[in-house]
C-alpha cells in the first residue's frame, strides 16, 4: 500500500481507539494479532478509562507506519502493579506498526515511562 494509505489507516485506528470503537479498531488488525491486541486494549482502558491519543508526528512507508503521539488520561485502575492514583497523565509514546494488505501484523510501542511514573508519584521528579 502507499505511504498515504498507510497514514490514513493509522489515523483511522487512533480515531477508533479514541471513540472506544474496539471492533472498528480490531478490523484493521490481522486476525493472528487480534486477541493479543484486545487484551492490551482491555489493560489500557482499565488503567486509563478516559485515555486519548493525539498524533504529534506520523510517517509511513510501503509496509509500515510510525506514530509519535501524546497519551492523556486519568489513572483510575491498576497499571503495571500500580494501584489507581486518580492522577492525570500526559506522556509521549511511539508506535511502529508493520502492515500487510492494510492490516497490522506486528506492533511495537515505546512510551516515556519516566514521565508517566513521575506523574503517578512512583518516582521522584527528575530521577531519569
Model-predicted regions and their roles:
Residues 1-128:
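C-terminal and inter-domain tail/linker signature
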Amino acid at each position: 500500500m502507499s505511504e498515504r494509505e498507510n497514514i490514513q489507516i493509522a489515523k483511522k485506528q487512533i480515531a477508533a481507539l479514541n471513540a472506544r470503537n474496539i471492533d472498528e479498531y480490531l478490523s484493521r488488525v490481522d486476525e493472528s494479532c487480534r486477541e493479543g491486541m484486545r487484551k492490551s486494549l482491555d489493560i489500557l482502558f482499565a488503567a486509563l478509562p478516559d485515555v486519548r491519543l493525539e498524533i504529534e508526528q506520523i510517517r509511513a512507508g510501503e509496509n509500515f507506519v510510525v506514530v509519535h503521539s501524546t497519551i492523556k488520561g486519568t489513572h483510575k485502575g491498576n497499571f503495571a502493579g500500580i494501584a489507581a492514583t486518580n492522577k492525570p497523565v500526559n506522556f509521549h509514546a511511539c508506535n511502529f506498526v508493520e502492515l500487510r494488505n492494510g492490516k497490522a501484523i506486528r506492533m511495537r510501542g515505546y512510551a516515556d515511562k519516566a514521565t508517566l511514573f513521575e506523574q503517578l508519584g512512583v518516582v521522584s521528579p527528575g530521577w531519569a
